[in-house]
Amino acid sequence: MKKCLLISLVAILILNAASFSQTNMSDQKYKWPENVKPPVAEKKPKEFTAHGDTRVDNYYWMNDYFKKGADSAKVVSYLTAENNYYKAMMASTEAFQEKLYNEMRARIKEKDESVPYFKNGYYYYTRQVEGKDYYIYARKKGTLTASEEILLDVNQMAEGFNYFSATGFSISPNNKLLAYGTDSKSRRQYVIRVKNLETGEILKDSITNTEGQAVWANDNKTLFYTAKNPVTLLSEKIKKHTLGNAESADVVVYEEKDPTNYIGVGNTKSEKYILIVSQATLSSELRYVSADSPDQPFVVFQPRMKEVLYDIDHADNQFYIRTNKDAKNFKLMTTPENATSVENWKEFIRHDDKVLIQGFDVFKNFLAINERKDGLTQVHIINTKTNESHFLAFDEPSYAAGVGYNPEFDTDVIRFNYTSLTTPASIYDYDMSKKTKKLLKQQDVLGGFNVKDYVTERLYATAADGTKIPMSVVYKKGFKKDGKGPVMLYGYGSYGASMDASFSSTRLSLLDRGFAFVIAHIRGGQEMGRYWYEDGKMFKKKNTFTDFITAAEYLIKNNFTSPKHLYASGGSAGGLLMGAVVNMRPDLWNGIVAQVPFVDVINTMSDASIPLTTNEYDEWGNPANKESYYYMKSYSPYDNVEKKNYPHMLITTGLHDSQVQYFEPAKWVAKLREMKSGNNVLLLHTDMEVGHGGASGRFKVLKDRAREYAFILALENITQ
């Protein structure tokens, strides 16, 4: 049920206001096919009783493909029937979808290269070549004028697969070996392999069912990795692998007994220590061992404390600790290497009710801290020798900035990232001593993109409880605030994930056709601090939905749009948001796009065999608890579908989704078809090859966006 941003592509058409005027949009409605009948799902009532309450689920049989039950084939037949209905209904938009795809792709600089970073004697970078979907990973020794050494060509690795993902690239300390993970099923169950970079040989070592990331010890032969439960997909063991040994000989160095915790393995920036983290929503615990002594047992850094989160890094013979102990928005502390328990922690940066500390990076003479204030990110630089501090300056009303990947310790230069709704992704080097910055690369947007053609705003809507809800807005000059403008409102609002204002070249295909795009920074995210998250989870979850509705009402009241021209989109937990708001206020929207939506809250959170369920009890609640059960039931989209008119809806899923299983959106659509009145279009598209993240290639994902945009644009009678 969790969360990445794909920065995409570019237009061959420059569309003028006369071609897609807001007046024309409101004059006519798109004519959908009338003689195509939607599938009618079979009803097989199944009763669930808890806390004296009985729910009847007529479509629970759709779980059978996941459960490998008797109705597995029938599930596939139903999904296929829905796909056929989708195809028939969208047939007249296929040429338009292709046009959208082509213009999105035309914005991409297909032959491109990342900014190199320097680590342990080599410059590392990625390349993309024209016409190919995936990255080539490469390096050069010592200088950028040296000959190129290709580490992995993912395009070659992906040949023959409908889906392919490579992740977790990790170079051994002696620079001779590369560990990496691959997934060809889209279930996020990675196989770790090791490549000899001197000979090009792929070693016989093959480690299955992992998170994909391996951490090297300093002996260049010992790897630590996270092993998954094959059914629930929970990360449940940290194992140690010695090169040359069979996977069956791997040693469990940590086993997580509490299924509500996530676990993972990493190392400190100094690479002196290997770390194991065990973290739930509300608390964490870390263990560490010297990277020089991988056979020694891991030592607990500080035993878990109730409702206390902490994470650490290491530099100059001490640990830095970010923690929310007595500090809701987190603070920074330090402790000696040989005294890591909490009584030895000393405050380095005090807590601030108005500033959320999101993360930090350590250098020989400086600390760089990712912070958030008033809903916007900021980069705070502290000289650890003089205690002098300053902030990087950013001028736009809405933006996203943060410290990038900085593997070097002994340097005064930090790399940071910057983007906004109108500024393509940009990478800078900043000299923390001289306070000067240098732009290294900005995402190329082809096809005549001009930042001066677009306008951004930062707006605030007032919720019923008086809370100010920030919104980031972008539109092309010429957008009229006359109540007739089409607006796409986007939201997420879960897990404390902040939806910052970032650039998307695909989005230009909406903006250039007269749309405004709005991000509602609703509670459940962390845009305004930790309390913003806590006010949008568990028994305050409904704030997420009412905040989004408040944002929509603001846009209507202030003449950005009207219900005839207002659209909403969200995916995963944002799909839950879509399901909740169409139940609560179906009258506000002309159309909805819900991607891989988490909508069957009670059933999913009651079934511990479903991946990730137990990890998320502190996010949604555990239905075994009576109070949680009834609160979750009061907003669960699937449980609250009613006999009423719903807006036009496009719902997408992937058959192999490991985060939100396919059956949630499938059941939801079946129930909506049964209950809804009116003639508004309801479509379900299931990708039979992929999972939660959608298509794996940089071009394939554009097909998904083109499909969604064609649906929304057709509702505005825009088909060119």
Task: Cite the ranges covered by each PLM segment.
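Positively charged n-region of N-terminal signal peptides that target proteins for export
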Residues: 1-4
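Beta-propeller folds
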Residues: 7-8, 12, 16-17, 21-413, ...
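Short hydrophobic segments within beta-strands
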Residues: 126, 322, 370, 417, ...
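Conserved beta-strand segments of alpha/beta enzyme cores
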Residues: 150, 252, 436, 516, ...
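Cap/lid segment of the alpha/beta-hydrolase catalytic domain
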Residues: 155-169, 180-187, 198-203, 430-436, ...
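Residue-level signal for short, function-critical loop segments
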Residues: 325, 366, 494, 572, ...
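Active-site-proximal cap/loop segments of hydrolase catalytic domains
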Residues: 519-720
